[in-house]
Amino acid sequence: MAAQSDKDVKYYTLEEIKKHNHSKSTWLILHHKVYDLTKFLEEHPGGEEVLREQAGGDATENFEDVGHSTDARELSKTFIIGELHPDDRSKLSKPMETLITTVDSNSSWWTNWVIPAISALIVALMYRLYMADD
């Protein structure tokens, strides 16, 4: 199968896609590709509502978070109707970057070993005192 050339690709603007956010016309964006899932709504294993919540917008992050199977990814290709216009790609909200925090190595040692050790010692002493009263 030959690769589709750029001139054969149908481009849609975000404004066009946003209009297709109801059960009679359900479009969404995955990785800058536009999908018409109207006929698939009732067949979707996760339910119609899942798709309708994302209709008219970018569902890439949610699609990836669910962890769809290879079969689902192959099936999705049959619903591609075009691509998001290159001028609108920068308008999509980008996922927030993960905040990475660093912990001082002494603090990590303290919280991982000393506090649990002291807690265990206190529990052992309380148990011993309780048993000694009997």
Curated annotation (Swiss-Prot):
Alphabetized InterPro entries for the sequence: Cyt_B5-like_heme/steroid-bd (IPR001199), Cyt_B5-like_heme/steroid_sf (IPR036400), Cyt_B5_heme-BS (IPR018506), Cytochrome_b5 (IPR050668)
Protein name (record): Cytochrome b5
Keywords: Acetylation, Electron transport, Endoplasmic reticulum, Heme, Iron, Membrane, Metal-binding, Microsome, Transmembrane, Transmembrane helix, Transport
GO molecular function: enzyme binding; heme binding; metal ion binding
Record organism: Oryctolagus cuniculus
Localization annotation: Endoplasmic reticulum membrane; Microsome membrane
Similarity annotation: Belongs to the cytochrome b5 family.
Modification type N6-acetyllysine: residues: 7, 10, 19
Binding site for heme: 44, 68
Matching Pfam families: Cyt-b5
Record SMART domains: Cyt-b5 (SM01117)
Record membrane topology: Single-pass membrane protein
Domain Cytochrome b5 heme-binding: from-to ranges: 9-85
Gene Ontology cellular-component terms listed: cytosol; endoplasmic reticulum membrane
Role this protein plays: Cytochrome b5 is a membrane-bound hemoprotein functioning as an electron carrier for several membrane-bound oxygenases.
N-acetylalanine PTM positions: 2
Main location: endoplasmic reticulum
Keyword Ligase: no
Electron transport keyword on record: yes
Stretches that traverse the bilayer: 109-131
